[in-house]
Regions:
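Feature captures the catalytic ectodomains and active-site-proximal regions of enzymes
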Residues: 4-439
Length: 439
């Protein structure tokens, strides 16, 4: 996460000297128990130079023992306790995709187009080999959108977002529904409204079940399961999938559902919380939805072109323009997370190096103007192929600040920094503001 602070920002009556750029490198961290981490292997002179001029530390982005999903982690590092405000990932993704939820009668899920054996329900690939194009996904979603479901006068709305990702909203015209239902995606286990990443999950679709004894939860589970079955029938015969199979590609013949929610989070907006003009730059629906839900001015980033130089130069230019108009600019860069999930350490290393070369290094020429924090929303070690509960590194730079003399920006080096170890991500901004930025 990269934080840039500028002239005379008032936060809770305090005066901050600098505008704030808050840059999150999604899934950048690995496990502190790994023999060697991606940050240790990466050639990243920009981040290392920042580290040498900064104070450093580690942070559990939600809490010890919690391997967070991205949404609850981002909510936390923005300064909110997700246990108090979180309503499930589904509504946040829906908001990011432009869908509104009819509270009480609709439940939103984050969904993955996936490949399954339609007879045994064995999951072959949770993400369709990561090669489902957004245009293919949108065509498949159109075949499912506005589906009528016979039970409880139900219906479903389906929107494809980016790649294999989608949002599914189920509803009933006659029954109230509750989001207290399980996931059918075995990679994430529901605990209340929060999902926890599961190491080595069983590769089978699980029926969605109510998490309490209410009729509303039972009805929601029944509609969701009926939607899943009908979706498999439609998708398995869809021309997009027939063509994919002919081309020796995996078919996107199922939707894995997780993280149900029935309402948008209600919390003090970011601009009010920090008494500043707060903007958020992101490309993924989940971060866009968080920005909208928590009152930031959202600046959507263009989808990646595949050319990292072009992509990160555009993102940096957008960042600098946003800093001309806003006191705090949160920037979320996705790069390192996917190769972590896919168990590809060399590709994760490459993604970090690309961000360093084309985004961070050019940013160094602005060190006289800004203070900077760099961190991650969670760890995604290639050794585990999932989010883990490991703490993530933080660096904080501000002109005139006495540095910790950390030579390289890595998990183990940051452990020795003067920021110490923050037990919760929601402590980061208040700590920095109170301890270092107040005049």
């Amino acid at each position: 996460v990269l934080l840039i602070l500028s002239d005379l920002i008032k936060v809770k009556g305090l005066i901050m000297k600098y505008r704030l750029l808050y840059l999150v490198l999604d899934g950048m961290a690995d496990s502190i128990n790994d023999e060697v981490t991606t940050l240790e292997l990466a050639d990243k002179p920009g981040l290392d130079e920042l580290a040498r001029k900064s104070i450093c530390g580690l942070m559990y982005t939600v809490g010890k023992g919690i391997a967070p999903e991205s949404d609850e982690a981002v909510i936390s590092i923005l300064g909110y306790d997700p246990h108090e405000v979180y309503t499930g990932r589904g509504p946040i993704e829906a908001l990011g995709a432009g869908l509104n939820i009819r509270e009480g009668y609709e439940v939103a899920f984050r969904a993955n187009f996936a490949t399954i054996n339609p007879v045994t329900r064995k999951i072959i690939d949770r993400r369709v080999g990561r090669n489902l194009s957004t245009s293919e996904a949108r065509e498949l979603a159109r075949a499912l959108d506005n589906m009528e479901i016979s039970i409880h006068q139900g219906y479903a709305k389906v929107v494809a977002t980016i790649g294999h990702r989608a949002v599914v909203v189920i509803g009933s015209r006659t029954r109230k529904l509750s989001p207290m239902v399980s996931n059918n995606d075995p990679a994430y286990q529901r605990k209340g409204l929060v999902s926890i990443a599961v190491e080595n999950p069983k590769p089978y679709v699980e029926p969605i079940t109510p998490l309490d004894n209410s009729e509303e939860s039972k009805a929601a589970a029944e509609i969701a399961n009926a939607f899943f079955e009908k979706a498999v029938e439609i998708l398995d015969k869809h021309p997009v999938n027939i063509k994919r199979v002919e081309n020796k590609l995996l078919p996107a013949n199922a939707l894995l559902l997780r993280d149900a929610g029935g309402s948008i989070p209600k919390a003090t907006p970011l601009g009010v919380k920090y008494n500043c003009r707060f903007s958020l730059l992101a490309e993924m629906p989940v971060e866009i939805g968080i920005g909208r839900a928590f009152g930031a001015e959202v600046i959507p980033l263009e989808p990646p072109t595949g050319d990292p130089r072009v992509d990160y130069e555009k993102r940096l230019n957008t960042t600098l323009k946003a800093l001309e108009k806003h006191d705090v600019v949160y920037v979320h860069l996705k790069g390192p997370d996917e190769p972590g999930h896919d168990g590809k350490p060399e590709l994760k290393k490459q993604k970090i190096e690309e961000i360093d070369k084309y985004y961070v290094q050019p940013l160094l020429s602005y060190l006289d103007k800004y203070a900077i924090i760099v961190t991650a929303d969670h760890a995604t070690p290639p050794s585990k192929k999932t989010h883990t509960d490991d703490p993530v590194p933080i660096l904080f730079y501000m002109p005139g600040l006495l540095p910790d003399n950390i030579e390289k920006f890595t998990e183990k080096n940051c452990m020795r920094g003067s920021l110490g170890i923050l037990e919760h991500g929601w402590l980061l901004l208040p700590t920095i503001i109170e301890k270092y930025l107040k005049n």
